[in-house]
Amino acid sequence: MIIRFKINEIECEVNEEKEDITILQACTANGIEIPRFCYHEKLTIAGNCRMCLVYVTNEEKLLAACGIPLDENFDDESIETEIDEILKAREGVMEFLLINHPLDCPICDQGGECDLQEQTLAYGLDTGRFYIKKRAVEIKTFGRLIKGIMTRCIHCTRCVRFLTEIAGVNELGVLGRGYNMEIGTYKKNVMIESELSGNIIDLCPVGALTSAVYAYKGRPWELKNIKGIDIFDTLLTPINYQVKGGEIFRILPRINDRINEEWITDKVRFHYESYKIIEKIRKETPSYKIQANKFIELTWKTALKMVFKVLLNKKNKVDLIIGSKINSTNLRIYKELMNRLGSKNYITENGLMFKKFNYDLRENYINSNDLYNVDKNDLVLLCGINLRVESPLLNIKLRNVNFGDDEIESVKKIGIIGNKFDWKHESEYIGATLNSMLKLFEGRLPYCQQIKKSKAPLIIVGPSLLTRISLTLQEMRAIFMKACNLKPENILIITQGANFGMALEEGLFKEKFSIGGNVLYSIDSNEVQVTNKINYVIYQGIINDKFENKIDLYLPSKHYFEDFEGDREVYMNTFGQRSEIEKLSISKGNKIKENSMIGYIQLMYLNNKEMTRKEKEQKDIKLSYREMKKEEKRKIKVNKYLTINNIIENYYMTDINIRLSKNLMITGQLRKEKKIMEAGIWKNRKCI
C-alpha cells in the first residue's frame, strides 16, 4: 500500500509493505533528517529521548516521530519538522539531557563520533541555565571488556533493549525513576554474560559505555579503516580493522543485512590485543631444534634446503595439515606442491573432524538457503549444535524470529537434539544421543508431526553430529530430506572453521584421511594432535601453543590478513557468499615471509628438478560412476547410544589469537567463577 503525505510542504510517498512505517522512518526514507537518541532500527521503539518531536496538523501537541505509524489518514495531513515551535522544543530537550552530563569531552573515548556532541551543536542552546549541583553516578563494572561511566548516560535504554531483545540476557535494567534513574545490573559487580555484549558500545550514543581495551588509546579521525572478516566464525562476518602506524587499535562491524546486520561477536571485537603479544614473543627467523627446548637460528636458504631434504626423501611419508585461516591462493599452491611430490596426504585442520567427503558438485557442501530469509521459518530443529558459542550471530537471528501466532499455544516451535543451552523461546528438548536422531528419522517422535505440519521448517546440523557419523555433507542432507520430506533449503549444515567451502572447492580433502605418516608439515595449524608415530615436525606459521615442544623445524610466516600478493583476497562462508578482505601489515620483522612466497619457492625448486605432471594427472582421476553409486548404497553403522556432545568447551579458548588475548582469557575464567563473582570475592580484581 502506497501512503502519500506532506513533509515541510513537500509531497512524499512511501510503500508500506509488511510492518507499520513510522513518521521517523518515512522522513528518513525521503532524505529528511530528524534527530534521535533512543531510536534504533533494529530495536523496539522506546520514545525516551523526545528529540524526534514533529508537528502534525490537526494534533494539539507535538508528537514523537519514532512512535507514530503512518496510515491512510495522513493523506490530508502535513508533517512539519523545522518550524519554530519544534526548534524550541528540541532546545529544551537538549537542555534536560545535558543537565547532569559531565564536561569531560576532551578525555572521553566517544569524542569525534558522539551523537550528543553533534546534536548539541546542531539543535542545542549556546548557553546553559542550570546552576544547581549536578548528579554523579559511580563507575560501574560490567566485566573486563566494557567500561561503564554512567554519569554520562542519558537513559536512552538502547543497551537494555539490545541485551534483552537480541542477545537474550536480562542483566541490564533501569533502576529508580526521575532524578534517581540509573541503568545498571541488579547486583553489584556482575559481568554481562553474552557473547555479543560489546555491541552495546556501538549502540551507546554517548560515552557512557566504551571499550575498556581501547580506553585512552586513539581518536577515530586518526585511524584508517581496512576491510576484514571474522575469521573465527563460518559466517565470515564483515568487519573493519581500525589501524594506526601498523597497529590495530579497534575492530568494528561493517553493516551487511544478509549476514550480521550490524553486530559482531566479542571474540572478534576484542581479540586484536593478542597480535601485539605475538609480535613480542614470536621468532623472526627460521629455527631448528638441536635438542629438547633448544633451537638454533637458520637462514631461509638453509631452512628451505632442510625442508626439501625431508620432503624429497622417499622413505618419508609426509602429512600436510593446513590451517583454517589460509586463503584460497595458498590452498592451491600447497595442493600443487603435494601433487608434484606424488602425495595426496593433505587436508585442512577443520576437515580432520569429518570422516568422508564428496566435493564433486558445489551443492554437496554449500548451503542453498539464505540467512537473510530465516525469518520465514516457522519451526527450528537444532541437531548437535550449541548456537550460542558455535555461531552467536546465527543464534540471535533465530532467537528473534517471529514464529507467528498458532491456534495451539502448547506447540513448541524449537526442538533440540544434543546438549542443552540457553534459549530465549520455549523449546522442546528431544534427547542427547544418536538414538533420538534415529527415532526422528523413523518418525517415532511426537516432534515429527510438528515438522510435517510446518510450512517452512529449518533443521540446523552442527559439527558435533557430523563428527559422530561417517557421512558426507550431501548424505547427511539427503537423509534429512527423505526422512522429514524436506527441500535442500530447509536444511542448514554448520561446519567449524573459516574457508571450509573454499577448501572443498579446491579439492583439498581426501577420502578416509588419517595422520599416519612419519613427517608432519603443519601450515598455521595449531589444533593437530602429534602422535608418537611422527618423528619429524615442520611448523610453518605464526606461533604454536599446542605442540611447540615437538617442533623440529620452524618457518615463521605472516598473519592471514597480510599473507597475499595483491591488495585483496577472497574468502567464502558456509552459504557460498564470498567476502573480500584488504591487506593489512602489522608484522614488524622484515625476515618473516608470506606462506605464498614459501610455497612458490618450493614449487620453483621442484620445477628445476624437471618433475612432470603426468603421474599427478593420472592420480587425480576421481571415482567412476559405478564406484560412486556403490558407495552411496553402503550401510551406515552407528552406535545409537553415543552422546552428541558439544565440540566447544570454552568459547574463549578456540584459537591461538583468542587464547593470547588477556582480556578474553580472563573473561572466560570469570564466567567459570560465577559463584565467586556473586559472592563478591572478585571485587578486588582489576576489571577496568
Curated annotation (Swiss-Prot):
Its cofactor is [2Fe-2S] cluster; [4Fe-4S] cluster. [4Fe-4S] cluster 1 binds at residues 101, 105, 108, 114. It catalyses: a ubiquinone + NADH + 5 H(+)(in) = a ubiquinol + NAD(+) + 4 H(+)(out). [4Fe-4S] cluster 2 binds at residues 153, 156, 159, 204. Residues 223-279 form the 4Fe-4S Mo/W bis-MGD-type domain. One of its GO terms (cellular component) is mitochondrial inner membrane. Residues 1-85 form the 2Fe-2S ferredoxin-type domain. The keyword Transmembrane helix does not apply. Binds 1 [2Fe-2S] cluster per subunit. Keywords: 2Fe-2S, 4Fe-4S, Electron transport, Iron, Iron-sulfur, Membrane, Metal-binding, Mitochondrion, Mitochondrion inner membrane, NAD, Oxidoreductase, Respiratory chain, Translocase, Transport, Ubiquinone. It holds the Pfam family Fer4_Nqo3. It is an enzyme of class 7 (translocase). GO terms for molecular function: 2 iron, 2 sulfur cluster binding; 4 iron, 4 sulfur cluster binding; metal ion binding; NADH dehydrogenase (ubiquinone) activity. One of its GO terms (biological process) is ATP synthesis coupled electron transport. The keyword Cytoplasm does not apply. [2Fe-2S] cluster binds at residues 38, 49, 52, 66. Its main location: mitochondrion. Its EC number is 7.1.1.2. It is found in: Mitochondrion inner membrane. Residues 85-124 form the 4Fe-4S His(Cys)3-ligated-type domain. Belongs to the complex I 75 kDa subunit family. Core subunit of the mitochondrial membrane respiratory chain NADH dehydrogenase (Complex I) that is believed to belong to the minimal assembly required for catalysis. Complex I functions in the transfer of electrons from NADH to the respiratory chain. The immediate electron acceptor for the enzyme is believed to be ubiquinone. This is the largest subunit of complex I and it is a component of the iron-sulfur (IP) fragment of the enzyme. It may form part of the active site crevice where NADH is oxidized. Complex I is composed of about 45 different subunits. This is NADH-ubiquinone oxidoreductase 75 kDa subunit. It comes from Dictyostelium discoideum. The lineage of its organism: Eukaryota, Amoebozoa, Evosea, Eumycetozoa, Dictyostelia.
